[in-house]
Amino acid sequence: MGKIIGIDLGTTNSCVAIMDGNKPRVLENAEGDRTTPSIIAYTQEGEVLVGQPAKRQAITNPKNTLFAIKRLIGRKFKDDEVQRDIKIMPYNIVNSDNGDAWIDVKKQKMAPPQISAEVLKKMKKTAEDYLGETIKEAVITVPAYFNDAQRQATKDAGRIAGLEVKRIINEPTAAALAYGLDKGKGNRTIAVYDLGGGTFDISIIEIDEVDKEKTFEVLATNGDTHLGGEDFDSRLINYLVTEFKKEQGIDLRNDPLSMQRLKESAEKAKIELSSAQQTDVNLPYITADSNGPKHLNIKVTRAKLESLVEDLILRSIEPLKVALKDAGLSVTDINDVILVGGQTRMPMVQSKVADFFGKEPRKDVNPDEAVAVGAAVQGGVLSGDVKDVLLLDVTPLSLGIETMGGIMTSLINKNTTIPTKHSQIFSTAEDNQSAVTIHVLQGERKRSSDNKSLGQFNLDGINPAPRGTAQIEVTFDIDSDGILHVSAKDKKTGKEQKITIKASSGLNEEEIKKMVNDAEANSEADQKFEELIQTRNQGDQLVHSIKKQLNENKNSIEEESKKDIQLALNKLENALKGEDKSDIEKNIQNLLKISSKLTEINQKKSEKDQKDNNMSANKKDENVVDAEFEEIKDPKK
């Protein structure tokens, strides 16, 4: 069995880790960084950039530079959270044919899983470059509070990237694995507070050790899948835009280029204010009017930032109370508090969490890497490389069906350990009913319409009978990824209908296959593009070198040879403007052949210069006179 890599597919940053022997190792990407910005750019030339290269060109290409895509994955266009994002994102979020939120890139509609797959491909390539082998399997993490549709969409992204997703695990659970693996003996109850770029989770986890086997059992989980660092950035951006409008009377919101520059600076200022009390946001030439260019220079203090985002931090405290209540624990039962996610570096976040739990959070867990490390550990468990670790995760939300009167009847309650299976008998609501519709729901509300609809199916062929007579057995089966399978069976006839809940919108099998094929085709195109760039660079270097030699040796070479070389140079320069790799290679060889005489002259000149330098050094040595000296001994006293 090959390596199963662990991937933290984050809203702001992503990270990949592997098990190296019995130790997890976070891998550096091609740019030498251990985390990769979850940013994807589609350039005018048709190139797809991921990570830092995408981030670097965001200012000049705001409409086609996509970030925080995880906030849209598995979501409907009409969702309130999506409608909020439409107002603040520089790129174009559109409604797809199935009602999902998609993105319009260069007049082409793209699904969030298809875009996220580009980040996963980079993570896969990072692992392949390090290991020197093809990677086909991965464990990918998701926020604990992700619903079924969001989990399915994440699995789809993995497939499009060419990965078989062996397991989807919750981010706080992964962080607990990273924390608990090398800790000493004894049982501990920990709280994992995970505030990332776009999502917030809290999980209460019990780590037990029996006969050298560690069991990580999730007791309860809660959260908010639309609360994170991006919201903190938005508050600061809005403040800066408002201040600038007060000073200059210009609203920067109408200028995507200015907003992209402002986003970058706001993120930087927020990070700086975690260690400094004050910072300057200084953006010269941010815009212009009839009076000339305008510059933005605003001082931001830590206190000001805290006043802008305090309500967001307080929003994260309520789920802590619910999670503790669901686990049947109080704050005094918590041994350790672990902080995960880049936003937890903010001092105010740390102090509010410390105030709630009555203890300082642990500082020995890397908030950016812990989740990927935990995913790698789970990958090791699945491949058999890691022994004596058992992970018991939970389903974050209750699952049930709609029953008479539009009520949701739960079959599996939230925080039930998975995998799990539960059956319940239901009956018909009307006389002589020959079919029932099973409407599957996820959520905590009593009214069906207030919960998320996961899908519905019909069970036909029920024998006509008075209402309440037929017996329909409905079974809910949740697998280790937290994905639901539902069956309904007529006890009398034995007739059964089964479905794996696919998000009622989501990508269908045909769409996923098409995206997988597109990704494979693009991979080939990307390889060809990379080879073209390398050949082009080789050609550029040769042109520069020959021009330099031609200039230095213009008096030593015959006029005819000079003309031939110049002609070959012109041909290569023209070829470099095109996209034909073989044409560039042909002209490189041609120039090398024709300029061989010039290279020979240049080499002889270099040898002569070297010889002259040596002779000059020897002459200097001949003129040196050795000093004479006489040793004088001290007279004896």
Curated annotation (Swiss-Prot):
Induction: By stress conditions e.g. heat shock. Belongs to the heat shock protein 70 family. It comes from Buchnera aphidicola subsp. Acyrthosiphon pisum (strain APS). Transmembrane segments: none annotated. The keyword Nucleotide-binding applies. This is Chaperone protein DnaK. Keywords: ATP-binding, Chaperone, Nucleotide-binding, Phosphoprotein, Stress response. CDD domains: ASKHA_NBD_HSP70_DnaK-like. The keyword Chaperone applies. The modification Phosphothreonine is found at T199. It comes from the Bacteria. NCBIfam families: PRK00290.1, PRK05183.1, prok_dnaK. GO terms for molecular function: ATP binding; ATP-dependent protein folding chaperone; unfolded protein binding. Residues 599-637 are annotated as: Disordered. Residues 602-623 have a biased composition (Basic and acidic residues). Acts as a chaperone.
